[in-house]
Structure formats: structure tokens, C-alpha cells
């Protein structure tokens, strides 16, 4: 026998639903998005650290502020509003899942380790971040640019991320 583990998300329904025969043969588990930002940050930082060790990346563990920023961006875009609730946002067509946040940071860590100074910087995160948000080159690009100009640009401690993301465009 063998085990098969696969993942999907609720927003990617595809053309056809899973057939009744397959539903009987597979155990499906639906995991909700983490309830709090702190819970999501904890999951992301733990998984990124595990992956970095497994890949034996010669980079330092990501600074918590980079993890926090990526998670905050994902949560704000996913929820359609800023953390403080003052600004309504358009949401991209992608899922903006916790798994994608982990992927963005893992990619940034690999870039920092092999092409940078071994420390995760905004420039290492920017390319993967833009790629995670912009799935549809028309609709999502507008959502991303609006978020970049109205939210990221206005946060004084995010100037480096704003510049790095603008350079990717």
C-alpha cells in the first residue's frame, strides 16, 4: 500500500468537483486560516526555520520583522482591509494562504543565502511577494499596485520593502 497526501485550497475549485467515488476513497481535511496574526506568524516562522534547516541554507534565520511584514500583507489582502480596519482593500484572485507566505519567505532565504549576504532583506522577499500576489496580470496587478501605493508606501518602517517592490515592477 501507499499513502498520498495532497493539498488544495477552497478558492481553487477548478472545473469539476471531486467525484463521489473519490470522496469515498479520500480523507479530506479542511484547515481554516489561522485565527490570529500571532498564530499565523508562529506557523510561518516555524515552517520556514524547518525548511531552512532541511535545505541547509547558509543564511541566518529570517528576522521576525520580515516574517511579520509578509504575514501582515497576506492577511490584509486576504481580508480586504488593513490591520487597523481603517482602509478597505481589494483582494487579489489568489488564495494568499499561509503556505504561500511560507513559500515567499523560503524563496527569499534562498536568494539571501546564495546571491546576497546571508541575511534576509526586503529585496530578497520582494520578487516572490509580487509573484504570490499577482496571479492575474491585469486584475491582480491593479490590486497590488493600489496596496503598494496606499498602504506600504505610507508605513514609515516599510520604506525598504516599498522600494524593493517598486524595483521588481
List PLM regions with ranges.
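Conserved AAA+ ATPase small/helical "lid" subdomain
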Residues: 41, 48-124
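C-terminal engagement/docking regions of AAA+ P-loop ATPases
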Residues: 113-169
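Generic structural signal for short, flexible, solvent-exposed coil/loop and linker residues
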Residues: 4-7, 11, 15-20, 59, ...
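Generic hydrophobic/packing signal
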Residues: 6-7, 21-24, 74, 95-96, ...
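Residues that form generic nucleotide/phosphate-binding pockets
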Residues: 25, 43, 47, 69, ...
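Context-gated lysine
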Residues: 13, 23, 46, 86-90, ...
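Canonical AAA+ ATPase core
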Residues: 1-56, 109-111
